Amino acid sequence: MATLFTVTTTSRPFPANPSKTFSPSISLKPNALSFSLTHHRPPRPLRFSKIRSSLPSESDSEPEGGYSITDEWGEQPAEPESPPDNAPSAVSDEWGEKSESVPEESVTRFAESDPPTNEDEWEEREADDGVDKTWELKRCLADTVYGTELGFRAGSEVRAEVLEIVNQLEALNPTQAPVENPELLDGNWVLLYTAFSELLPLLAAGSTPLLKVKSISQSIDTKSLSIDNSTTLSSPFADFSFSATASFEVRTPSRIEVSFKEGTLKPPEIKSSVDLPESVGVFGQEINLSFLKQSLNPLQDVAANISRAISGQPPLKLPFPGNRGSSWLLTTYLDKDLRISRGDGGLFVLAREGSSLLEL
């Protein structure tokens, strides 16, 4: 082990007697030698910047670039850049990290879109949407009942679909008082579909191979308070028409009481040529009628003579017995093209004669 010696000098105050000389004392004090593996960086000398006096003087003037401040290592720290005026303020979170705050969007009571040009613009748009929806429902109803032979051949699914569309149209009824709107109620209405049980025998007869229901229509006249129901049957030889005349009384703005008076059987209209189909289906079998059609061609002249003879005959009128001709009719939907009515448990869907619904 090495031993270090340190020299300590002790100074004493000068004696009052100058004749005595100064004698320093030397003491040797051993210290233990220690080794350290840690490298110590020699300290750098501290530099102190010039301290300005609080009282300015003429000779001590501030330099042109201002005073610079150095740290303990003699390096000049970079001055922090001042944030721009429009920069978002930083927010410190719980971890001490700074995040830029998101600028809030400007809140305004006015919508970005232009305001309506007039107060009724939104009402007009809603009205247009209602008209488009109603027209689509009417077209869908006409397409659904097409090919059902006025409802006689409609299955349960088709009947349920028709009833659903009818309910939607009744909810959009634009005419709440049909009887009080003769300009819409009056006229000739063509039957598109019915679920009236009393018409089923007639529709069944019209589904035979040589007899078809050509049309069923209803004419209403609010001035005379009368209704005329007409039916036309078509065969290869002639067309047969009969009608039922009734009077009605207004019970409510949408309901009338109907009383049938008499039925009328018009003379048949003999066709100038026999209009036979090429074949007919009977009990699931197809029967060819070409030979029968050729055999009846010589009888066309005879049929024309019969037609001219009976064309001038008056129609045959038959009265309705008792109260069997009484009924009621409730109109649940009415516009310029379509009318929906209910009566005695039956449903009637009719289109105005000449309407585009008949062309679908």
Curated annotation (Swiss-Prot):
Transit peptide segment: 1-52
Region entry Disordered, spans: 1-130
Intracellular or extracellular location(s): Plastid, Chloroplast
Protein name (record): Plastid lipid-associated protein 3, chloroplastic
Family note: Belongs to the PAP/fibrillin family.
Organism: Brassica campestris (Field mustard)
Extent of Polar residues compositional bias: 1-37
Coiled coil: none
Keywords: Chloroplast, Plastid, Transit peptide
Induction: Down-regulated by drought and oxidative stresses. Up-regulated by wounding.
Bias type Low complexity, positions: 53-68
Keyword Plastid among UniProt keywords: yes
Principal location: plastid
Highest taxon listed in the record's lineage: Eukaryota
GO cellular component, one term: chloroplast
Biased composition (Acidic residues): 117-127
Listed transmembrane segments: none
Compositional bias (Basic residues): 38-50
Tissue/organ expression: Ubiquitous expression among various organs, but only at a very low level.
